[in-house]
Amino acid sequence: MSFKMTQSQYTSLYGPTVGDSVRLGDTNLFARVEKDYATYGDEAAFGGGKSIRDGMAQNPNVTRDDKQVADLVITNALILDYDKIVKADIGVKNGYIMKIGKAGNPDIMDNVDIIIGATTDIISAEGKIVTAGGIDTHVHFVNPEQSQVALESGITTHIGGGTGASEGAKATTVTPGPWHLHRMLLAAESLPLNIGFTGKGQAVNHTALVEQIHAGAIGLKVHEDWGATPSALDHALQVADDYDVQIALHADTLNEAGFMEETMAAVKDRVLHMYHTEGAGGGHAPDLIKSAAYSNILPSSTNPTLPYTVNTIDEHLDMVMITHHLNASIPEDIAFADSRIRKETIAAEDVLQDIGVFSMVSSDSQAMGRVGEVITRTWQVAHRMKEQRGSLDGDSEYNDNNRIKRYIAKYTINPAITHGISDYVGSIDEGKLADIIMWEPAFFAVKPDVIVKGGLINPAINGDANGSIPTSEPLKYRKMYGQLGGNMQGTSMTFVSTTAYENDIGKLLGLKRKLRPVHNIRKLTKADMKNNSATPKIDVDPQTYEVFVDGEKITSEPATELPLTQRYFLF
């Protein structure tokens, strides 16, 4: 016998369904459900009097050996991803996403492709948003505490370089040489994130570069503080082509060895990841931003200039001076800092993100960027651009799906593609590591509710351990069992070069984490950047620094207030 209920009743039980819209935090953005995998009336839900009970939505006969039986089911989740905004159950097995579909007991329920059995645990996601774990590809490994801060913001993968609080690490995202790379690979065993390290890219002797790739580096960083010359860049790219790794470039702010055009001539048609492409974080002054028009350049922003606000310019000068070891008593050092901070190019950066010219967002952690704010600032930009520029083509009232898919790609799938790890992480897709972030919609992009890392909860908001219920105050992020014993190694990956993987670097160093090789990098173009592949003509006026896209001046007004800010940090 069928039972009818109102849409509001249904939503309160099982979350939104097709046609419903969900507001993201206190932004002006709304996600509309495009598809619901549920069979109405056969929804799987856990709790007293609910359907996931023996002989009902839980099958009493199956064992874990059945390939369709999940270790974990996340029920009735609203999935926001670069290619879908859907309501579904998520099945996890052996720490990987097994299936996105309909969970339950196929003996009595229709359309079940994820079986719940006696060996299955449940996380209830009714009314909650689920996203893939974020990927930050511009990390200065200056402080190991960054990992926990990032994890609690929804980031599950860090790529970059460093060795701790050395001047080189604080400035240049470089882990130089085999000895340092091996030490950092060992250190990664105790970090709760997926990790990949970049080596130093400055050497005309290819052996000095190749030995870093053999030691596990997943790419090389060419940075102006070590000398971002056309020669250094050319040699690094030659090695990258030989070993299928990525080159990350912090270009030559002072134009000492040439201008932007000379750098691009040295790059030729070879792919590289251009860091902080607007230029405030470093790079050819004043026109590095033009490089985003090239089809072989994969451009990213770092978060200190995102979004553009009334405070952005003032805070940046001190950041540049400290990060790059400059001396305030030397006029040339002051001029160096001043050359990087241009309100005209910063004002254009948000727009270039919004129209899909800039493809990624990263942090630049403790080196002019904030490791725990990649996700928050990405969505603040999306809000500001809708506020100033209106809806994107194809979006409408209470439906910002196109803009949502564009912006979520910037810190999930696109950085994964750029660094050759998209087979493993970067989206909510079958076969990928179960790095899954759950959000209460009101707290979206600020404070995740539950972080699932490699199939295990770690961490989660939880109450006083002596409380009679799990919500006894103080509610705060607490480490879970995913960070205890051997689970730190079992739920995270360390990414290494293919040559290091094939030569069993894990055995050499006694590593226990899952090692995975980076690959499919050197043939990438900007067309591979999901929802962010535009290559218009970009010009910069050398006198005024105004930015023009296809002949049209682009700019934005500095924000005086933003969503996802103070009201979320009173407790």
From Swiss-Prot:
Residues with the N6-carboxylysine modification: 221
Cofactors that this protein relies on: Ni cation
Compartment list: Cytoplasm
Record keywords: Cytoplasm, Hydrolase, Metal-binding, Nickel
SUPFAM superfamilies: Composite domain of metallo-dependent hydrolases, Metallo-dependent hydrolases
GO cellular component: cytoplasm
Protein residues bound to Ni(2+) 1: 138, 140, 221, 364
Post-translational changes noted in the entry: Carboxylation allows a single lysine to coordinate two nickel ions.
Binding-site residues, Ni(2+) 2: 221, 250, 276
Entry's EC annotation: 3.5.1.5
Lineage: superkingdom: Bacteria
Regions that span the bilayer: none
Protein's UniProt name: Urease subunit alpha
Taxonomic lineage from the root: Bacteria, Bacillati, Bacillota, Bacilli, Bacillales
